[in-house]
Regions:
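Short, basic/aromatic beta-hairpin or loop at an interaction surface
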Residues: 68-77
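Short histidine-centered beta-strand/loop micro-motifs
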Residues: 40-43, 88, 94
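HotDog/MaoC-like acyl-thioester-processing domains
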Residues: 1-17, 90-95, 101-175
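Catalytic strand-loop segment that frames the active site of acyl-thioester-processing enzymes
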Residues: 2-59, 160-175
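Short structured motifs
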Residues: 80-86
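Generic structural detector for well-ordered beta-strands
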Residues: 30-34, 85, 131
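Membrane-helix exit/interface motif
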Residues: 61-66
Length: 175
């Protein structure tokens, strides 16, 4: 439950924007492993990684000044698909960094990478296909969101593995 509170704070009382931060710059979220994050095997439950990544994405938007802009338009992010590869267990009290970055976008989806590390070692890597909706439920084109956040008109080329993943997950835009 405390992770949900952390996400609510990151979303509704976002941290201050970082001057000069763009939508393509990485954003770092720092936290510690808490007792409530652990499963019966005494390591972080896989669902908790997803909660940490949710907070990381909210902080990414906050860091580039996006939260008030999105709120003014009634736009909000949702996850269309995600995949996480777990590399190392996290245990009670460990310091954790979640580095979130936008890799690129197509007409519908923004693609993000989220890397979870502890002590400089990789614990997990997530790939997320995110989209934005309006309060009425209409889809907001990813390029419109990127433009609102001051990003470039043209998406960087997606890494090959992410482009292949997007096709396999059936989230990639079909021309």
């Amino acid at each position: 439950m405390t992770r949900q509170i952390q996400l609510a704070l990151a979303t509704f009382r976002p941290r201050r924007a970082i001057p000069g931060q763009t939508v393509l710059d990485p954003s770092v979220t720092r936290t510690r492993v808490r007792l409530g994050d652990l499963d019966i095997y005494r390591h972080v439950n896989n669902a908790v990684y997803l909660n940490m990544m949710d907070t990381g994405r909210s902080n990414l938007l906050a860091d580039c000044g996006g939260m008030p802009l999105l709120n003014d338009r009634g736009w909000y992010p949702v996850v269309a698909a995600s995949t996480v590869k777990y590399r190392r267990s996290l245990t009670l009290g460990q310091r954790v960094e979640i580095t979130s970055r936008v890799l690129g976008w197509d007409p519908r989806i923004a693609y993000l990478e989220q890397v979870v590390t502890t002590g400089g070692q990789l614990a997990a890597r997530g790939i997320v296909a995110g989209r934005f909706l309006s309060k009425t439920g209409d889809r907001v084109p990813a390029p419109d969101v990127v433009a609102l956040l001051g990003g470039p008109e043209t998406s960087p080329a997606l890494p090959d593995d992410v482009a292949a993943w997007a096709r396999a997950m059936d989230v990639a835009h079909r021309s």
